[in-house]
């Protein structure tokens, strides 16, 4: 009753897909020339030498807006398949999707009222 042989193709694929990236890293490490100089160690921004320090600290507001964008973007990705099969799913799926949409909206309203989305 030991059915491990049924997964031979899976194990072969897993081994091959693990060996190829390892070989690529090893071969590039052996063949690539390692030359460090002042030009390679300097920072580079769109073909122009940077003015001032290359490390800037961003305000936390940027991260808040990025986080809100990612939440609603992921929500859109999850809602798209639901919208494509809406006619087949029925009322219970509609209620579940409504709850799924309302949770981030309630969170956004809460953050808005607390002033987390204010730019001042």
Swiss-Prot record:
It is a multi-pass membrane protein. GO terms for molecular function: NADH dehydrogenase (ubiquinone) activity; quinone binding. One of its GO terms (cellular component) is NADH dehydrogenase complex. Disulfide bonds: none annotated. Its EC number is 7.1.1.-. One of its GO terms (biological process) is photosynthesis, light reaction. It catalyses: a plastoquinone + NADH + (n+1) H(+)(in) = a plastoquinol + NAD(+) + n H(+)(out); a plastoquinone + NADPH + (n+1) H(+)(in) = a plastoquinol + NADP(+) + n H(+)(out). It is an enzyme of class 7 (translocase). Keywords: Chloroplast, Membrane, NAD, NADP, Plastid, Plastoquinone, Quinone, Thylakoid, Translocase, Transmembrane, Transmembrane helix, Transport. It is found in: Plastid, Chloroplast thylakoid membrane. The chain crosses the membrane at residues 9-29, 64-84, 88-108. NDH shuttles electrons from NAD(P)H:plastoquinone, via FMN and iron-sulfur (Fe-S) centers, to quinones in the photosynthetic chain and possibly in a chloroplast respiratory chain. The immediate electron acceptor for the enzyme in this species is believed to be plastoquinone. Couples the redox reaction to proton translocation, and thus conserves the redox energy in a proton gradient. HAMAP family: NDH1_NuoA (MF_01394). NDH is composed of at least 16 different subunits, 5 of which are encoded in the nucleus. Belongs to the complex I subunit 3 family. This is NAD(P)H-quinone oxidoreductase subunit 3, chloroplastic. It comes from Illicium oligandrum (Star anise).
